[in-house]
């Protein structure tokens, strides 16, 4: 598998951004991938989440830092996971430019959905990203009228959805110490995150093979297990 750089971004805070970044990095470690975790969010929660790895069997496969440099493109790690700050500043823009995939977690509310148009347009025009490189992860969508409106906005905008993750009581929504995996998630709770990891890997492979249609890139299909 080629190196994959994933940035997790939304200009709106409190949408599950760091939780997704933490669990993606941990899944990669469990699958024996070398992981570089880059914490660009001043809150430092992404860094704090991995404190338990210092004395674990994963320590030889993992390192963390709080800066992003051009030389990271040549880093030996298999997965680079970047937790962006909740603002479209120069730090986030550099991460968006650097990443292969920009995962955008969204809740069924106006504030997490409103930046999508500007973000997509800027990423496409300024950094040459394709729509396929900016998948959404839906969090907490249900049968409510607000979720229906949010789904309509997503469909009308043509935004690809990588995964739809319900909120489970076993997963803290806002984490201060993100020891998610060590808490022992139930299999049902882990599944959507494992699906997201697999779909990202598959999407990157498809784009590398020249697939350009956004629906084909993110369609269900064979991928890394």
Per-region residue spans from a language model:
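Extreme N-terminal starter segment of soluble prokaryotic enzymes
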Residues: 2-6
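P-loop/Walker-type NTP enzyme "switch/lid" segment
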Residues: 9-15, 30-80, 86, 176
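Hydrophobic positions on the alpha1 helix immediately C-terminal to the Walker A/P-loop
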Residues: 19-20
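Inter-motif core of Ras-like GTPase G domains
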Residues: 91-110
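Conserved C-terminal guanine-recognition region of P-loop GTPase G domains, centered on the G4
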Residues: 118-128
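Inter-lobe coupling/hinge region of RecA-like P-loop helicase motors
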Residues: 169-201
């Amino acid at each position: 598998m080629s190196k994959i750089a994933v940035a997790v971004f939304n200009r709106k805070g409190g949408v599950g951004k760091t939780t997704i970044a933490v669990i993606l990095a941990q899944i990669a470690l469990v699958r024996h991938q070398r992981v570089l975790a880059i914490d660009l969010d001043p809150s430092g929660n992404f860094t704090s989440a991995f404190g338990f790895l210092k004395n674990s069997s994963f320590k030889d496969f993992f390192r963390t830092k709080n800066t992003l440099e051009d030389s990271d493109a040549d880093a030996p790690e298999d997965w680079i996971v970047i937790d962006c700050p909740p603002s479209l500043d120069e730090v986030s823009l550099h991460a968006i430019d650097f990443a292969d995939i920009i995962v955008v977690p969204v809740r069924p509310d106006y504030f997490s959905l409103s930046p999508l148009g500007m973000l997509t347009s800027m990423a496409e025009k300024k950094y040459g990203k394709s729509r396929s490189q900016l998948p959404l992860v839906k969090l907490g969508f249900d049968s409510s009228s607000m979720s229906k409106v949010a789904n309509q906005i997503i469909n009308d905008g043509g935004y690809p959805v990588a995964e739809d993750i319900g909120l489970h009581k076993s997963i803290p929504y806002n984490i201060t110490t993100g020891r998610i995996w060590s808490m022992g998630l139930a299999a049902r709770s882990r599944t959507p995150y494992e699906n997201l990891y697999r779909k990202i890997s598959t999407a990157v492979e498809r784009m590398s093979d020249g697939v350009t249609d956004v629906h084909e890139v993110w369609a269900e299909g064979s991928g890394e297990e």
